[in-house]
């Protein structure tokens, strides 16, 4: 099969822990996501055995406003929140696997290019080249507030910042 005919498969683990758990009373009791890394270790090993190419960890630094413009329902019912920073998990998973890649999300709006380059260079080394960056400009006002801003930066300004970010960050990531 040629490269042109190859399909690459990724598992999106962004919201794995809460998508529908809010519908099941008591579903948080004993849930493995918060107590240990074994849950993700098993997923990584299983995905690699299944010849998947990538585990994708989408992320945000704030809650969504998908339910009536408020984060109340999200927080009260645990819908896609809370979430852990998966950065520390990547080296653990990479040591347990040999082929599968990992994609980690980092915002160009709230992170500094030096920090981003430093993190991804380190992850590139410890994963032996199996790391990808899901660069986002962020979208939620609660994320802005969590980073110390009263309002979300305007859409155009976020994308101008992202362009500048890539210009200064990308050359250091090679």
Placement of each model-derived feature along the sequence:
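Secondary-structure transition/capping motifs at alpha-helix termini
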Residues: 1, 96-100, 124-131
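N-terminal beta1-alpha1-beta2 module of alpha/beta enzyme domains
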Residues: 1-96
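Hydrophobic faces of well-ordered beta-strands that scaffold small-molecule active sites
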Residues: 7-11, 55-57, 100-106, 129-135
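A broadly tuned preference for mixed-charge, low-complexity surface segments
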Residues: 53-67, 102-112, 156-157, 162
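Aromatic/His-enriched, Gly/Pro-containing loop or helix-boundary segments
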Residues: 79-93, 100-113, 156
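Flexible, glycine-rich active-site loops centered on histidine and acidic residues
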Residues: 12-33, 108-174
């Amino acid at each position: 099969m040629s490269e042109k005919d190859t399909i690459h498969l990724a598992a999106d683990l962004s919201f794995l822990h809460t998508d529908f758990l809010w519908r099941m009373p008591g579903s948080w009791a004993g849930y493995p996501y918060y107590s240990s890394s074994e849950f993700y270790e098993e997923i990584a090993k299983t995905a690699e055995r299944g010849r998947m190419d990538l585990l994708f960890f989408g992320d945000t630094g704030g809650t969504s406003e998908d339910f009536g413009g408020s984060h109340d329902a999200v927080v009260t019912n645990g819908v896609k929140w809370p979430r852990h920073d998966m950065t520390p998990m990547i080296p653990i998973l990479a040591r347990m696997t040999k082929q599968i890649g990992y994609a980690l999300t980092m915002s160009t709006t709230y992170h500094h290019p030096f920090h981003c380059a430093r993190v991804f260079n380190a992850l590139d080394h410890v994963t032996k080249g199996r790391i990808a960056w899901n660069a986002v400009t962020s979208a939620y006002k609660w994320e802005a507030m969590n980073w110390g801003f009263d309002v979300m930066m305007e859409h155009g300004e976020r994308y101008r910042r992202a362009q500048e970010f890539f210009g200064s960050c990308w050359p250091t990531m090679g």
